[in-house]
Amino acid sequence: SITMVQALGGYAEANVWLIVAAVFFSRGIINSGLGKRIAYTLIRSFGTSSLKLAYALACTDLIISPATPSNTARGGGIVFPIVQNISLAFDSEPYGNTARRIGAYLMTTAHTINTITVTIFLTACSGNLLITSLGAKLFGYDISWWEWFQAGVIPGVICMILMPWFIYKIYPPEIKETPEAAAMAQKELDALGPITKAEISVAIIFVLCILLW
């Protein structure tokens, strides 16, 4: 058996509360609609081709990843529905012979980028925080948020720049130009309406916490 102190000792870990805070932020980004607004704004501005669409999705993942400690929630809750909407708009279904029109390329790229952003930010995945906590106990050195970022940002950004282009070359979509994407993104932004107080609050808290971390 274990003592009450041992049973509750985990609640004293700073990394545990960092995970809890980041989970709250991730729900705020998803529920407020801020994540979708960021994604559709980038698509409206840069999504004139399938390659640029991939980079817009990559930038979306990069922007929201510091406050979403689950790459599954980030990919499945924000990025995946957007990729699905874009694919269906171009009649690209996951089954049958239309997947290669654009959906397969965007989905493969989004999945790849989702795993890359995990390496850039400590709070992009709860597993990162567990690793640093375990490392601190075993080796007596606790890696800070800033130290993790310094170590991961250069290789991570290089991979983010190269991978959409690399996948585009080895697994190219049939549709190269996507002028309709901007109009689709604008339609989605119109449906979201003006930016809300909740989105502004989440954005301010998000930026402040990143600076404080």
What is the predicted role of each segment?
Residues 1-3, 22-33, 136, 167-176, ...:
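Structural signal for alpha-helical transmembrane segments and their membrane-water exit/capping regions
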Residues 24, 28, 59-63, 67, ...:
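Residues within alpha-helical transmembrane segments of multi-pass membrane proteins, especially transporters
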Residues 2-95:
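Membrane-embedded alpha-helical segments and adjacent helix-loop junctions characteristic
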Residues 20, 24, 59, 63, ...:
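Generic alpha-helical transmembrane segments of integral inner-membrane proteins
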Residues 71-75, 90-204:
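Juxtamembrane and boundary regions of transmembrane helices in multi-pass small-molecule transporters
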Residues 54-58, 130, 206:
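Generic alpha-helical secondary structure signal
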